[in-house]
Amino acid sequence: MDSKAIEIVRNYIVDHLDKSDKMPEFEVYVVWKCKALQNWKYLLSSTLLDGMYYEMTYNGDKKEWYLDAYKKFENRCIPD
């Protein structure tokens, strides 16, 4: 399952890169994953410095993958 999630995200990234730029070298990696019954949930990111992260969900009943792509705008510490 890991390799399929990584492959889907990698293909998504390549499809959305600026075609006028040289293809950068990058890796896609799993940040977090869990399995509930026949379903999988993944959070993934890449070594590109674009602030993107990806959520992959595998529906085991339907044998389908779902991809959500997010842009991180800010990371801030809020003290108690």
Residues covered by each model-derived region:
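Short, non-transmembrane alpha-helical segments in secretory-pathway proteins
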Residues: 1-27
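Amphipathic, interaction-prone secondary-structure segments
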Residues: 27-64
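A short, surface-exposed interaction/processing loop segment used at functional sites
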Residues: 62-80
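Generic preference for flexible, low-structure residues
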Residues: 21, 25, 60, 72-74
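Compositionally biased, low-structure terminal segments
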Residues: 13, 27-30, 71-74
